[in-house]
């Protein structure tokens, strides 16, 4: 059962953006892509490990449109499967060239610990009445961006990049990750439900998102109280709750401000690519992939 649950988790789909970014960063500096495959698999297995444990902490019954491992087999199996996936990630990582292993392990370990720090911040925010934009951006940098940053850094290291180029790619991925998460926040409330993703889940769960935090910072006290309590109003349907909160967002110009921040972070990311020592033609694929992520509709 242990390996069948791991297989179930890995077969669940997803964007595979972390291994893609690792391979694309690697490809900026070399065409010998086979050397990066074990590390690419490692970051994807690690990411899925975090999702297994996230679902336990969030009491989440669904993951990628299917019952979560936690819901299907229970918390004990989900914990054990996640632990095994973490070990599998390290085993895959051990296949990188021996001379690079200490640097890559150091990068991976720092990344993994920062992801845990980000998850703790996210849980702390659930019981915190007021969260600032600065605090939120720091949390999503740890929870989302650093895994992208670790992935591109490891890929670049394996490709023979200089330390300076590795640092630049890390910063590129931090900015891209921030743009990606802010867009996730925006799409949860303003995405197209015809594309198969439910709209308004963050509002109904009372999650601290960039939209909610920005609205709270711009609202008067009566409006802040409405933002806090609308989702709890038993007289309203879920659709009415979502519509009521979105009307406040619209009145406070929150969607435009969020889009502005997404564009700012994304443009910063692309500008960093232009400073790499590699020929611009070799950065084209990672640039196009980044553009596809920020241009998505769900």
Language-model features and meaning:
Residues 1-298:
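All-alpha prenyltransferase/terpene-synthase fold signal
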């Amino acid at each position: 059962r242990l390996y069948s649950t791991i297989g179930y988790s890995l077969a669940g789909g997803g964007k595979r953006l972390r291994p893609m970014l690792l391979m694309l960063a690697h490809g900026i500096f070399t065409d010998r892509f086979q050397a990066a495959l074990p590390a690419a698999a490692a970051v994807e297995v690690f990411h899925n490990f975090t999702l297994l444990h996230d679902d336990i902490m969030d009491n989440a019954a669904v993951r990628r449109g299917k019952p979560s491992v936690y819901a299907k087999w229970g918390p004990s199996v989900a914990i054990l499967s996640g632990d095994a996936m973490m070990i599998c990630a390290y085993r895959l990582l051990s296949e990188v060239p021996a001379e690079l292993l200490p640097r890559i392990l150091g990068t991976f370990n720092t990344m993994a610990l920062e992801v845990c720090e980000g998850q703790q911040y996210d849980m702390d925010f659930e019981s915190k009445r007021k969260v600032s934009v600065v605090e939120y951006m720091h949390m999503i940098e740890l929870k989302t961006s650093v895994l992208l940053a670790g992935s591109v850094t490891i890929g670049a290291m394996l490709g023979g990049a200089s330390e300076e180029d590795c640092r630049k790619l890390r910063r590129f991925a931090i900015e891209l990750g921030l743009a990606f998460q802010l867009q996730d926040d925006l799409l949860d409330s303003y995405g197209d439900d015809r594309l198969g993703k439910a709209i308004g889940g963050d509002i109904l769960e009372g999650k601290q998102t960039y939209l909610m935090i920005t609205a709270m910072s711009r609202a008067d006290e009566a409006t802040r109280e409405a933002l806090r309590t609308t989702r709890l109003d038993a007289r309203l349907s879920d659709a009415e709750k979502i519509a009521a909160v979105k009307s406040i967002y619209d009145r406070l110009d929150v969607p435009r401000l969020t889009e502005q921040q997404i564009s700012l972070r994304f443009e910063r990311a692309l500008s960093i690519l232009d400073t790499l020592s590699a020929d611009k033609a070799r950065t084209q694929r990672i640039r196009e992939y980044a553009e596809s992520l920020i241009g998505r509709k769900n």
